[in-house]
Amino acid sequence: MPIHEFQVVGRHVPTERDANPKIYRMRLFAQTSIHAKSRFWYFLSKIVKMKKSTGEILNVTEIFEDKPQKVKNFGVFIRYNSRSGTHNIYKEYRDLTRCGAVSQMYDEMASRHSARESSIHIIDIKEIAASLTRRANTKQFHDSKIKFPLTHRIAKSKSTFVANRPNTFFC
């Protein structure tokens, strides 16, 4: 299921003591709005002394990319729990959208570090200029004269019958 970006707004339930409680807003990456609300309560309980039973969700909206046809560089600050402890990491990705960059990050963290989505906390994600990129993997695409190999350009017509026997010996 693809990842979407949500903005979740919530607060404490108003009481006689506090008629206008403080409002909290978070931008979260999740597959569904239900999962985003769940992550909102998870992070809010870590930051403020509040939980789902004493709070209310005011609004959940999906955030869409302004220019989804333009390739951008994204810097992602994350914190994740591994078998040996908690680590802070900065990673860079090139993608069309923030959600695409986060999907790349989740795939890479799962393959390289065996870190699952539940153990990864995205602290910040920013669109960064080409001059501010740090990683060589991202910088290699900033060349204006970059060339890629164009493979299998000639379409070869295959005949119905072939004059020689098939080769079954492969090294």
From Swiss-Prot:
It comes from the Eukaryota. GO terms for cellular component: cytosolic large ribosomal subunit. GO terms for molecular function: structural constituent of ribosome. The keyword Ribosomal protein applies. GO terms for biological process: cytoplasmic translation. The keyword Ribonucleoprotein applies. Keywords: Ribonucleoprotein, Ribosomal protein. Pfam families: Ribosomal_L18A. Coiled coil: none annotated. Signal peptide: none annotated. Belongs to the eukaryotic ribosomal protein eL20 family. This is Large ribosomal subunit protein eL20. It comes from Dictyostelium discoideum (Social amoeba).
